[in-house]
């Protein structure tokens, strides 16, 4: 019996793995196992209240740890890491994604075969192996008529839970827009790449397990659900405001507010603490966002 072939060392040396943690201490042990042998790893901690930083220092001593003074959001934290990357590629990796050196090397080697590509993602699966929907096509360009990807695809959007970046192609376009605290930052990034005629590839032969919503853990899960609803609603509105204008964002807010009120009422009548917290967070997020003030701030800054 022959020993398994080790992942190409050259491929691993060409990439820096970037991880953003926020109360993600429970994920660090699995990350450390999967990334053993990866020479370049940067972890950015978004002011966690748990022992995420201590576990990174203990279990991933070779990783560079950047501690943010406050939670600046997913995009801003990744930007802090991207600014430090000196390799050809960067790999964004959510703490709740289980990967290893073979998968990382396969992503890098596949990307090298497509020198025009800016971004590339694997096929994500859940813990049972079921495929997750982590990419889509621009609806105004064409409508897909097939099922799951069976070969390399060039798409309009790909989820940044696991995303390989060719640095020389993304730098001129800019990294994540810190306007988006959480959610829609990858939609915005992909749209800018797509508008610049960049390639966003899906590499379905590489599969990575994504334990969706597993990055953050605490003793108040309803609070995490409230935050998800709050930031998802705000980021959705901000995306529309940025790319379609304030009038479109106002119309969207009216529609989503109406549906959010109905959703809250439904969750009160059919109690589910987590779903009620998420629905209430969505409602509050929409109410709290001042589009007019935001427009004035951006006009003054720009």
PLM regions and their residue ranges:
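A conserved acidic beta->alpha catalytic loop
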Residues: 45-54, 70
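Nucleotide-sugar-dependent glycosyltransferase catalytic core
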Residues: 209-234, 274
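Acidic helix N-cap motif at the loop->helix transition within catalytic regions
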Residues: 26-30, 50-58
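Short aromatic/hydrophobic "clamp" motif used to bind/position activated sugar donors
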Residues: 90
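Acidic/His-rich active-site region of diverse nucleotide-sugar glycosyltransferases
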Residues: 70, 76-84, 97-181, 187
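Short, well-formed alpha-helical segments that are part of the catalytic scaffolds
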Residues: 19-37
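Non-catalytic, C-terminal membrane-associated alpha-helical segments of glycosyltransferases
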Residues: 227-234, 246-302
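Catalytic donor-sugar/metal-binding loop of nucleotide-sugar-dependent glycosyltransferases
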Residues: 171, 175-181, 187-209
């Amino acid at each position: 019996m022959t020993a398994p072939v080790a992942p190409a060392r050259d491929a691993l040396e060409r990439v820096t793995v970037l991880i953003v943690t926020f109360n993600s201490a429970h994920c660090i042990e699995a990350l450390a196992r999967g990334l053993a042998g990866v020479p370049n790893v940067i972890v950015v901690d978004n002011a966690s209240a748990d022992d995420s930083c201590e576990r990174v220092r203990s279990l991933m001593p070779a990783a560079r740890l950047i501690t943010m003074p406050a939670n600046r959001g997913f995009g801003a934290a990744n930007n802090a890491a991207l600014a430090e990357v000196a390799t050809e590629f960067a790999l964004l990796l959510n703490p709740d994604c289980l990967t290893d050196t073979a998968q990382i090397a396969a992503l890098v080697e596949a990307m090298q075969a497509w020198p025009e590509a800016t971004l590339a993602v694997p096929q994500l699966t859940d813990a049972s192996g079921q495929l997750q929907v982590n990419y889509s096509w621009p609806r105004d360009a064409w409508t897909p008529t097939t099922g799951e990807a069976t070969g390399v695809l060039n798409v309009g959007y790909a989820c940044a839970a696991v995303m390989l970046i060719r640095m020389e192609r993304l730098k001129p376009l800019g990294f994540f827009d810190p306007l988006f605290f959480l959610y829609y930052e990858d939609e915005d990034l992909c749209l800018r790449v797509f508008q610049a005629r960049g390639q966003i590839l899906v590499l379905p032969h590489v599969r990575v397990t994504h334990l969706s919503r597993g990055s953050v853990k605490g003793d108040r899960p309803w609070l995490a659900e409230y935050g998800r609803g709050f930031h998802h609603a705000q980021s959705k509105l901000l995306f529309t405001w940025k790319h379609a204008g304030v009038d479109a964002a106002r119309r969207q807010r009216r529609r989503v507010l109406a549906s959010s009120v109905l959703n809250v009422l439904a969750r009160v009548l059919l109690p589910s603490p987590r779903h009620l917290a998420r629905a209430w967070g969505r409602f509050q997020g929409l109410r709290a966002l001042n589009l007019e003030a935001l427009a004035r701030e951006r006009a003054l800054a720009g």
